[in-house]
Amino acid sequence: MAIKTAFAPVLTVPNGITDIDFYKNAFGATTNFCLTNDDGSIHVAELLIDGALFHVHEETQQSTMVSPAKYGASTVTIGLFVDDVQAMFNRAAAAGATVMTPVTDYEYGYRQGDLKDPFGHKWTIQCRIPVSSDWKP
């Protein structure tokens, strides 16, 4: 059986049980499944945003993965393509995300805005729009 290639980011958060609620409130994420460790921490939660899959792990003493908030920086940006950028952007901000760059239309054919979630992960909420006739790559 052929498998369609997909990209599934893995995000690490300080407190999985409560932090997953941010993704539900901000982006309408749903939980596909959630596995816990013996101490009650989250080993992995598989979440979906309108069918787009991602995983959340909780920081633990045994893990080498940490939330970007621990160092005040992130090495990646999660690009989330949606139909209504402004509505999703506003929803995420209302749920506790920090606005980094407001939603802007760019001449190269993107409407996008940048947010930082409460755990330090950077999100670009975006969609394609017509390229400006003045734009030259």
Label the model's feature ranges.
Residues 1-11, 20-116, 126-137:
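Vicinal oxygen chelate
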